[in-house]
Design a protein with these regions (language model features):
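Alpha-helical residues within the helix-turn-helix
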Residues: 13, 24, 52
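A short, Lys/Arg-rich alpha-helix, primarily the initiator
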Residues: 1-21
C-alpha cells in the first residue's frame, strides 16, 4: 500500500494557492514539501498542520492506494 498526495496538489490548484503560501501557512519546510511532491512519507503532524491551514479533512489531501 502506498500514500498519494495528489489530492493535496489538486486542492491547491482549486484554491489558487501557491506552494510557498501553503508552506508558510502550515509551517512546512521546503524539504518536507518536496517529500509530499515525491510521494514520500511525512509525519502525521505535518499532515495535520496542512489540514489546519487549508481548513480540510485529511482525506481531502491524501489517499491510500493498494498495490496489486
Amino acid at each position: 500500500m502506498e500514500l498519494s498526495y495528489k489530492r493535496l496538489f489538486k486542492k491547491l490548484i482549486d484554491l489558487d494557492m501557491q506552494h510557498n503560501e501553503l508552506m508558510e501557512k502550515a509551517n512546512v519546510s521546503r524539504s518536507t514539501f518536496y517529500k509530499l511532491k515525491n510521494g514520500e512519507n511525512v509525519t502525521t503532524d505535518v499532515l495535520l498542520r496542512i489540514c489546519d491551514a487549508l481548513d480540510c479533512d485529511i482525506s481531502e489531501i491524501m489517499e491510500c492506494i493498494k498495490n496489486d
